[in-house]
């Protein structure tokens, strides 16, 4: 009665994430409300500006605050952690502006520490792969639309179904830049896997399929930003 889980649903989020959240809440007896996140309708969002995440988070948390107040609650919390402090995270500005709590950051917990504590508590999500919305796969300034979001979603699902543990398919025009864990690069370039991935991604709409030799890392689209932009 004291907690409501609010889950966003939109074309920027894979259906698998929504289904996993629903299953978790149902299994643990948590009241869940699913809210439509309509970020593609936000003025300027589709143009993918550098403050894209701010635009989305501000709109989403305004909706969540409305739900909280309708249910007699006076607090809203989100799940960022200390690792998020080291990257460009304009969404955290919206968190601060709207008075949303960040308990994991306030406790100064890193992602690794959260995983360790989750494992000790027996939570099935302790080793869940990191996830960020599909809009974060687009190079800044490239138009975001439903078709390309679908291309990214299908490409990442393919890689997960093939047994890769942490994946990103970054989109540069009609070029796919694949990131997998460094330890899985050897696997992805095996002839059978390489040809299957290239064939499928071209089927999904990509013209070229490339592999990032640095491997998976969070926020790789921010590597082209100047330090002064990141500090804003």
Language model region names:
Residues 1-120, 161, 176, 192, ...:
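ATP-dependent adenylation/nucleotidyltransferase module used to activate substrates
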Residues 1-4, 153-232:
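Peripheral terminal appendages
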Residues 6, 35, 78, 128, ...:
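Residue-level detector of family-conserved "landmark" positions at structurally sensitive sites
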Residues 40, 139-141, 183-185:
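A short, flexible beta-alpha/helix-coil linker loop
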Residues 53, 148-152, 225:
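A general structural signal for short secondary-structure boundary/capping elements
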Residues 88-95, 142-146, 226-232:
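Short, electropositive alpha-helical surface patch
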Residues 105-109, 115-159, 166-168:
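Mid-to-C-terminal catalytic subdomains of enzymes
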């Amino acid at each position: 009665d004291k907690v409501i889980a609010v889950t966003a649903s939109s074309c920027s989020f894979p259906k698998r994430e929504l289904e996993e959240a629903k299953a978790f809440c149902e299994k643990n007896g948590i009241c869940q409300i699913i809210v439509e996140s309509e970020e593609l309708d936000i003025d300027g969002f589709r143009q993918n500006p550098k403050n894209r995440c701010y635009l989305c988070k501000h709109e989403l948390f305004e909706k969540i605050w409305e739900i909280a107040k309708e249910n007699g609650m006076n607090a809203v919390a989100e799940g960022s952690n200390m690792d998020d402090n080291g990257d460009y995270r304009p969404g955290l500005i919206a968190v601060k502006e709207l008075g949303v709590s960040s308990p994991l950051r306030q406790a100064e917990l890193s992602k690794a520490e959260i995983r360790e504590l989750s494992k000790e508590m027996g939570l099935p999500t302790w080793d869940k792969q990191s996830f960020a919305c599909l809009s974060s796969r687009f190079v800044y300034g490239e138009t975001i639309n439903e078709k390309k979001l679908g291309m990214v979603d299908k490409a990442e699902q393919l890689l997960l179904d093939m047994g890769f543990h942490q994946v990103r398919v970054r989109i540069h025009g009609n070029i796919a830049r694949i990131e997998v864990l460094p330890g899985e690069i050897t696997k992805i370039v095996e002839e059978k896997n390489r040809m299957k991935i290239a064939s499928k991604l071209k089927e999904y709409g990509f013209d070229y399929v490339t592999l990032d030799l640095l491997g998976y890392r969070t926020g790789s689209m921010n590597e082209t930003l100047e330090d002064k932009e990141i500090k804003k």
